[in-house]
Amino acid sequence: MASRTVLLPSAVLILRLLSLGLLAASLALIAADKLNVDSDPPQRYTFRDVYAYRYVLAVAVIGCAYTLLQLPLAAVSIIASGNNKRGIGAGGGSVAVALLVLVLLADVVFALLLATGAAAGFAFTYDVKRYLDGQFDDDSIGTPEVDKLHRDMDKFFDLAYAAAGLMLAAAACMALVIMLSVYSLARQVRSDYI
């Protein structure tokens, strides 16, 4: 059975790994999202054609890089906790607290960035999908070309919704990491000064 001191850093590592997986899936979905329109000339739309989707992709890339940088710190924290040390900045008193606060602030900025990426993806997709659904009047529904275009557009926007949803789930994971980090910081400050 894992000791109680290892549970908190282990939970943080698991949440960071989950966040990385969600961001990688979001990145894959938004990068693969495309819409082909059979017109004269044929047109193809991808995330590059929509600034909000470019932002979602950029946030996913930055998020993956940040999470990959944080994974070794989470692993070191588990090892140090298993050895009855304090993890990041072990034994440094106020230096350890300063490092924990720095990591915590970086996590907050990262969580906010993820939330804005998800919001941009959701907001643009909702507005454009609602507008385009209103453009398909009842007279044009039923023709095979229009039905195919409508299905293709729905698929394009559904993939964008999925990418934004995965990014929102990654932001929720980071919010949990922040809560666990604040608890750990409060526990460490209490043990240092009381």
Swiss-Prot record:
Highest taxon of source: Eukaryota
GO cellular component, one term: plasma membrane
Pfam families linked to this entry: CASP_dom (PF04535)
Keyword Transmembrane helix part of the UniProt annotation: yes
Cytoplasmic topological domain: 1-10, 77-94, 183-194
PANTHER family, A to Z: CASP-LIKE PROTEIN 4A4 (PTHR33573), CASP-LIKE PROTEIN 4D1 (PTHR33573:SF17)
Name by which UniProt lists this protein: CASP-like protein 4D1
